[in-house]
Amino acid sequence: NLRCSLTGDGMERRIYLSDYTWTEDDYIPGQIKFIMSAPEKMGKASVRFYLNDGYTAPEEVEEEAVDTKSELYCTMIERSLMNLGNTYRIRKAIEKARAGKEVTLAYIGGSITQGAGATPINTECYAYKSYQLFKSRFAMRDNVKFVKAGVGGTPSELGMLRFDRDVLRDGEKPDIVVVEFAVNDDCYESLVRKILKLDWNPAVVLLFSVFANDWNLQDRLSPVGRLYDLPMVSIKDTVVEQFTKKPNEGRVLTKNQFFYDMFHPS
């Protein structure tokens, strides 16, 4: 790893790659990461690459803004539905919301559910935005509640403990629970069963995110969803195909537009 300190005074700091000893694994520069002096601090940085004399680079292709109203975008989103499953419990929750009864949407998972990569983290994360969409479509009054229990780096083993503490706190009885964990462990199915067996019969939706290397755990974890006939959503199936397309091939978004870093969407 190449490390250096930055002053944050707006002055350019140049790092000459030729000054460092490279190994065979270092022939392609990888992730660029900025670590702030204190948690929650933010800053703005511009990264430029300069070529030595005699070297050239391909012309940069400008990325077009993502058109979320386009037919291509809608087609891309349709691919996210990995399994429709038994929607009875979801439909019951929608009926409650439309009748003006109190409905609670809960989200439990890791850093993506927490909102890593979203700015601001509490209102631009997928959990809050999907809750807002549900509320706008089905709520009669202010009768839809939101519970977010996302903690970065936690497996479903801890999720078993956190579900009671963070989701069922204050007597909450969620009607729909979205489960998102990027870590495979033996407690994943146990967590799903724990939620399904609650007295008030909440719906469970499984969400599979994807990393920048186009990998996720849906092949290992989706059998749990199929066993219990649960709705499953795959971000991998939605966006990975886009990353190899050119603008004239129906590309909707680029990998650079989708990812905030190696693990989290923007």
Show where each model-derived region lies:
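N-terminal secretory targeting modules
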Residues: 1-108, 113-121, 132, 136-143, ...
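Alpha-helical cap/lid subdomain in secreted, periplasmic
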Residues: 7, 98-101, 125-145, 152-154, ...
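Short hydrophobic segments within beta-strands
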Residues: 106-109, 149, 207
